Amino acid sequence: MARLQAFKDPSFHSLVATFRSLPLIRRFVLGLILLLICQQLAVLTWRFLLPEDSRIVGVSVTPAQAKEKPATPGDFTLFGHAPDADASTVNDAALSGDIPLTSLNISLTGVLASGDAKRSIAIIAKDSQQYSRNVGDAIPGYEAKIVTISADRVVLQYQGRYEALHLYQEEEATGAPSSSGAFNQVKDEIQKDPFSAQDYLTISPVTEEEVLKGYQLNPGKNPDLFYRAGLQDNDLAVSLNGMDLRDADQAQQAMAQLAGMSKFNLTVERDGQQQDIYLALDGDH
């Protein structure tokens, strides 16, 4: 009796991919539907393929090419291991009260937030370079270090005080919109409640003799985005960027690499034929 190999380490309870400006409506729709698909796939892999004692909280991700500490399959921290020091005391202090925004010339382009501080990662951009950093790590070019990492910000310790660095802080400060109002509304809704993604998209694992055949995609109660993305009822998702979502190891690798992807190719089976849905964040698709 065939069985899928369980993931060796905890994976994502939820995965929320936040795309920056998508000028064309097709890119907007495909980007949002991909957000929903990846979030739902992450929840399903966590439910069906992980050990019973796995525990993980919300994750927030933006497509970014992180440098240093490369990801390896089976390692949830993706880019390396955080220091062993217990920062629980300083974490409580850093998260209480209002914290001023940092004036450092850096931006936060991605976050992987875990209930275990040692597993959380911040992707920080400075001078056109991007770096992955854990709690306790130093900020490139500054005598500052990361104190806490949460779903939408990191808290830094710089010159004896705490400062906050938020996702899209630079865009919010200049008043520039990061995406359309509709995208922000759905993104915020999913970030607050990951399972609300089911209002737009439902995903069900399809098995045959206990072997996973793929993930069946269907519209939720708000089906407009589903159909505008070119999806059809009962499409069967089988791979992402060439990695087989039906294989536990490859599915884990696909989820782990999402933070560094700028091009996405979701393959679905439809009426016995494979169809590709393609999105390039840096192109005109």
From Swiss-Prot:
Instruction: Please give the residue ranges for the topological domain Cytoplasmic.
Output: 1-27
Please indicate the ranges of residues that lie on the Periplasmic side. Answer: 49-285
* Predominant location category: membrane
Q: Which InterPro entries match?
A: PDZ_sf, T2SS_GspC_N, T2SS_protein-GspC
Q: Where in the cell is it found?
A: Cell inner membrane
GO CC aspect terms: plasma membrane; type II protein secretion system complex
What family does the Swiss-Prot or TrEMBL record give for this protein? Belongs to the GSP C family.
* UniProt keyword Transmembrane helix, yes or no: yes
Q: Which Gene3D superfamilies match?
A: 2.30.30.830, 2.30.42.10
The transmembrane segments are 28-48
The protein, known as: Type II secretion system protein C
Ordered alphabetically, the record's keywords are:
Cell inner membrane, Cell membrane, Membrane, Protein transport, Transmembrane, Transmembrane helix, Transport
Upper classification of the source organism reads:
Bacteria, Pseudomonadati, Pseudomonadota, Gammaproteobacteria, Enterobacterales
BP GO terms, sorted:
protein secretion by the type II secretion system
Q: Record's superkingdom?
A: Bacteria
- What the protein does? Involved in a type II secretion system (T2SS, formerly general secretion pathway, GSP) for the export of proteins. Required for the translocation of the multiple pectic enzymes.
